[in-house]
């Protein structure tokens, strides 16, 4: 099964908590703090794997969560960092942020790696909080939470040459005759339901990658059939080989088909429409009258194309000429990165980690309630039964401006302040 788009949720690892510990050793009655730091959480890393050609793995696994860092230990032992989670993706995968649909990264190079989200920093142990005036801190810092993100993976095949044309014109036959690719071939429409890639390696020419794009039909640019899905795979190709069934045995008019396909390209992307094309009149062995080819060639040249190649993929007649022309043109067409404007790029906000603080007055009980993620983090860092730890606790409240805000709200001496399950009386 060929899967070229997937949505997944990712989350980096949480940092380990710093330890609260004191040196306990015989003959050392006043051993100081020796709590170690927590380890950093694991990162989420994307890596290109050329052995993968589809996003099928993401059809069954939708969540990727990196390992948390270990908590710090006694004797200044640092917690082990969480293992990074490496997610392998096919070359040509574009990563978008789901909500905005903006591009985070274009993974288009062999073995390319990209750190998608960093793990949370490990918290400091109480050894780091010791000062000449605070020699035995009974508090430590909890680890920072990991980052999370919902992303869309979109695969756009990387090929030098794209085979373009209506269904059943001979694209798969040409690919199978010139590469080791084995696309399904049969004499009916939509035999090919997924793109196929093959490497053209012929003596005397530089090898190149060719893609058989499933047959595009009229209205593809508006999403008729699987048009949009197929058209996007052509975007990365440098050269198009536009194949037309010149025999007309299926009741189609070759020139009309040629024009319609180009109209679909233009509707989808002007840049794609403007891409160099080699025009190929296939199934020439079934042609009953050479005038049909000559008329087609004349009309195509009137549109500005220099030449039409007469070919029969089934008998290999004219195939070598088309392949050599493709190789020649590729030498003159520079390799370009996928163009992504600033407006299309997802730029994450710089995270100076801040925690929400909410202060409300409970009129019924005349209590000031402080809540939010800041409270959760602060309470997890202190020992409320230790006087030194409580002094640190009140210092943080002052430094964060919470005490000033309480005074502005009209708090009075003896009023109760509650943080989760912890309460204290406010004293002027």
UniProtKB/Swiss-Prot annotation:
Entry binding sites for GTP: 165-172, 190-194, 212-215, 282-285, 312-314
Pfam families for the chain: DUF1967, GTP1_OBG, MMR_HSR1
All copies of domain OCT, residue ranges: 345-428
GO-annotated cellular components: cytoplasm
Subcellular location: Cytoplasm
Keywords: Cytoplasm, GTP-binding, Hydrolase, Magnesium, Metal-binding, Nucleotide-binding
GO biological process assignments: ribosome biogenesis
Superkingdom of the source species: Bacteria
Primary location recorded for the protein, binned into one broad class: cytoplasm
Cofactor: Mg(2+)
InterPro entries: G_OBG, GTP-bd, GTP-bd_Obg/CgtA, GTP-bd_prot_GTP1/OBG_C_sf, GTP1-OBG_CS, GTP1_OBG_dom, GTP1_OBG_dom_sf, OBG_GTPase
Binding site residues for Mg(2+): 172, 192
Broad class of enzyme this protein falls into: hydrolase
One function term, GO molecular function aspect: GTP binding
Family: Belongs to the TRAFAC class OBG-HflX-like GTPase superfamily. OBG GTPase family.
Assembly and oligomerization: Monomer.
Protein name as catalogued: GTPase Obg
Native source species: Clostridium botulinum (strain Alaska E43 / Type E3)
Organism taxonomic ancestry: Bacteria, Bacillati, Bacillota, Clostridia, Eubacteriales
């Amino acid at each position: 099964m060929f899967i070229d788009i997937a949505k997944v949720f990712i989350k980096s690892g949480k940092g380990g908590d710093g330890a609260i510990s004191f040196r306990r050793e015989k003959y050392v009655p006043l051993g100081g703090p020796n709590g170690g730091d927590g380890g950093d959480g694991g990162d989420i890393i994307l890596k290109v794997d050329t052995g993968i050609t589809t996003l099928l793995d993401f059809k069954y696994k939708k969540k990727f969560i990196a390992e948390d860092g270990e908590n710090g230990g006694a004797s200044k032992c640092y917690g082990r960092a969480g293992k990074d989670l490496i997610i392998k993706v096919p070359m040509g995968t574009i990563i978008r942020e789901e909500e905005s649909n903006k591009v985070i990264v274009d993974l288009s190079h062999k073995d390319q790696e990209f750190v998608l989200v960093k793990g949370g920093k490990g918290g400091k142990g109480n050894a780091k909080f010791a000062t000449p005036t605070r020699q035995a801190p009974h508090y430590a810092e909890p680890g920072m939470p990991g980052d999370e993100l919902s992303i869309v993976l979109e695969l756009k095949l990387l090929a030098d040459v794209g085979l373009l044309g209506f269904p059943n014109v001979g694209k798969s036959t040409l690919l199978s005759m010139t590469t080791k690719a084995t696309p399904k071939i049969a004499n009916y429409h939509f035999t090919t339901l997924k793109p196929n890639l093959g490497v053209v390696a012929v003596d005397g020419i530089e090898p190149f990658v060719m893609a058989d794009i499933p047959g595009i039909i009229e209205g593809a640019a508006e999403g008729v059939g699987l048009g949009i899905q197929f058209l996007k795979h052509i975007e990365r190709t440098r050269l198009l080989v536009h194949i037309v069934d010149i025999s007309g045995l299926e009741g189609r008019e070759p020139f009309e088909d040629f024009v319609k396909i180009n109209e679909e390209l233009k509707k989808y992307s002007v840049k794609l429409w403007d891409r160099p094309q080699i025009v190929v009149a296939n199934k020439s062995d079934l042609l009953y009258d050479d005038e049909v080819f000559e008329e087609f060639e004349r009309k195509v040249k009137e549109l500005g194309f220099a030449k039409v190649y007469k070919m029969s993929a089934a008998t290999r007649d004219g195939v070598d000429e088309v392949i050599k022309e493709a190789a020649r043109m590729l030498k003159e067409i520079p390799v370009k990165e996928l163009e992504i404007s600033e407006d299309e790029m997802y730029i994450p906000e710089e995270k100076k980690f801040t925690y929400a603080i909410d202060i409300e007055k409970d009129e019924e009980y005349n209590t000031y309630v402080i809540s939010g993620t800041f409270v959760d983090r602060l309470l997890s860092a202190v020992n409320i039964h230790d006087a030194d730890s409580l002094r640190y606790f009140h210092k943080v409240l002052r430094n964060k401006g919470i005490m000033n805000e309480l005074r502005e709200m009209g708090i009075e001496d003896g009023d109760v302040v509650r943080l989760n399950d912890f309460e204290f009386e406010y004293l002027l």
